[in-house]
């Protein structure tokens, strides 16, 4: 048994039911689980946890409005349009309600995005995948992306601040904490200075930082800061962590299959932070088991 949860990311599309997923996880030594944003109400109907513990809910869950639809409609907590923003807040509230119902401690929150032309980021990613990050054309594309983001960021951040204050008040009434997750894409919120802003809104311990190791490494690989900066600046505010590995920009590998500096990660993780293995379903059960053992060896996870 381990002090780490297994995300349903590894189960959706692989098992017929959540019960089957929990059973498979238990066979691998898991007693804790995170429900992610691919779990809808139909999957939850009649669910018997049978003693399994849900430690965290990754919004939007239940995903009756899929994440893709929320993004396409800009129904996000960062939306400048008030109706869209309220729809985004409502989606997170549904996840808070579910956390309260299931006894989860934390809702993992995506704080939205900066509304810019995402083709700017796609162009940069394409150059990276072509092996051209040291060429002038990459630096130029990166500069265009950063400038576009900077010109728009405060407009979206105003909406995020307002949304977060509302959500923190709602979550506090249910005894739920909100973990603001660092994101994979550069145009998404937050960057480190934005996270510092959001963690100091006056929401107290209700709002903390949820560190995603693969996302931080992806941004470093693209040339946007360092992975360690997130941990150094916000290590004391970490309430949870998504553990997965990455090669280049290909993330959600089982730990040990990529290039994450796990010794560095382990140095910063608070003992009481929730830990979740967020491995994609392309990882075999053998790779998953080996990944957890790797995390134990590196000091990121404890065997109980």
Where would I find each of the regions flagged by the language model?
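N-terminal small/glycine-rich loop or linker at the start of catalytic domains
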Residues: 1-9, 56, 63-77, 137-144
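Histidine-acidic metal/acid-base catalytic patches
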Residues: 1-4, 8, 12-26, 41, ...
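Short, hydrophobic beta-strand segments that form beta-sheet elements in well-ordered domains
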Residues: 6, 29-37
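Conserved beta-strand edge residues that scaffold enzyme active sites
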Residues: 39-40, 61, 113-114, 185, ...
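Short loop/turn segments at strand-loop or loop-helix junctions that form parts
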Residues: 58-62, 109-114, 244-245
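Active-site acidic/histidine proton-transfer and metal-coordination neighborhood
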Residues: 77-208
